[in-house]
Amino acid sequence: MYAATLPPDPDNAALLYYQAFLLRPDPDAETSASIDKVIRGGEPDEKLREYLNLSDCRETIEFAEAAAQLPYCNWGIRFSQGLGARLPQLEHFRPLRFLLYADARVLAMDGDYHAALNRCLTIRRIASHVGDDTMLNYVVSTDIDGSALRYIQNILGSMLPDAEILTWLRGQLASVQGAVLSPARVLEMDLELIMQSMRNDPNDLLWLREQLVEDNEGKSAEYFWNMTDEELLALITEPYADFLDYALGVIDSEMPYEEKYVELQRLTDKFKEEFSNIPGTNQLAIAFAPQIIEIYSLQVRYTAQFNALKSAIGIYLVTANTGRLPDTLPDYLPKDPFSGQDFEYEFTEDGFILRCRAKDIYWTSHTLWPPNTPPDVLARSIVYEYEYKIQSNTESN
């Protein structure tokens, strides 16, 4: 007797995401404007609903949802290409997340807030799958997750506080993995990709040997010419690897934000000064060492946004149970990572604001202001605040 046996569905989420990318229909100009309006806070219109009801749109969402539920995701990155490895999938996540959020906004408008928030959680899962295999993956992953947190913030502001949904959401945020917080793996992978790029270019290795022979005063020319390629790479990269170890130790320490930032800056300046004249290592010192502070700052900004959202859910829960905003922050809410203290809590006409108590040192010093910017603007510190809205049947002081 014949018994059909179908092979199982793919267990690699990337295969489903790639199909979602191919299925997603390109919106026309009018629909693109509708999507952009929703992303900027506007309401969904009929043109957007028509687009979302297309069969290819529904299947795109279904494939993305199925992919996001899988634990394993391998994008097929050709790591052997080093820093030249192509990442064509990354450009597709922006329109995909916009599509998912547009659908979430329609669901919220129709009163299905649970499903709307689930769409946003799918975007968080996608951020986790984008991963930290390369520096670009890490940055895109964090950006996607930050968008998901903003989208959740917007959905919460469109609904009446509901204790059941809020309790469920709080649990989901604790269990659903978003972007990888620790920069350790991506920084170590970055170094490995740098080394692989050098391996791939014999002319680059030849130039490095010639420069070391020419510039080194303590070793003979034969010492460098007799080195294997791997020994040469180790000589060039070991100082940077040691620097990474020290820097990651600082990031993982219990030091407060400002002390960590100052120490990372000191380590970076010291490394650049010590190795700026050593061929090969000087390229790492100039091009890659400064990104430690950039990545750490990105991590802290993301943590502030995530902690603010979790704190806001605590406030919404009190509001759902009492019918009014609490006078002060509930106990045991996450802290502002810039200051290590509770967020500042301020009432507004239609909700509340959570504000960090200390500035973002990196962006305060690196913001590029246009010419003729007033001095009082130039003197401002970058301090983040997060505004949350409450629907009108609640009250505040």
Which sequence ranges carry the predicted segments?
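Short acidic linear motifs
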Residues: 1-397
